Amino acid sequence: MKKQIKTAVILMLVGGLLTAAAFLMAFYTAEVQTFGTVNLTKAQAAASNTVFEVAPANLQPIDGTINYLRPWLSQKIFYFHVPLAEASFLIFTVAAFFAIMFLSKRRKSFDTKSRIAMEVAFLFVIATMITGDLWTRASWGMWWDWDPRLTTYLIMMLLMLVYFVLRNSIEDEERRAMYASVFCIIAWIDAPISFFITRIIPSQHPVVFNSGMASSNLVPFIVAQVGMIMIGYAIYTLRVGEEQSRERLEIIKEAIEN
């Protein structure tokens, strides 16, 4: 247990340092890129009171809408927001994996690991939504838009919320674990949909790996991604250790009382 906690603390520290370093690189060494333009109708531009710089004439569409250059601030949020979102998908996948393991093996430890992974994934989803709102405001001039990526990600957050409500509404431990595992797997289907939807149907949300990132931008992005995953794994490991300690104490307490 001590080794597990020590490993988690080291991962947390290294992950925090990598994330901080990536954010500093984003401000001081990364090339400022506009990541293209954002397209708004005249009504949207007026409603959002946008102050974005109008894109050059050769980038203007012929359908009457207006293209604006994305401001530099959206690029800085990008180094924090995208790694959070990628980590949330990954941790959600871990939760679904342990849910499948529980249904096949019926071992309580798999349900515990699935629940804790869901807790960590939910934490990352909330952080992604907050930074995403800041990005949306900076990039599109509005706090929210029913864009396919945003909508499917919001659905994913709500499904996670329902997962915890479901767990708390069932008293029987075995039934609770079984229903929660089934729901976790069904809810996880939304994760790949949300991840790939910008590649399938038209969306304002940029596709990161098709954005032509310069090497000075790619390095801090990868560093931030690694750091964020390390932080996520550290939180997960600490929570698993805490839960295992609590379960051991309950076993000892029951043994003493009997």
Over which residues does each language-model region extend?
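Polytopic transmembrane helical bundles with strong interfacial aromatic enrichment
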Residues: 1-258
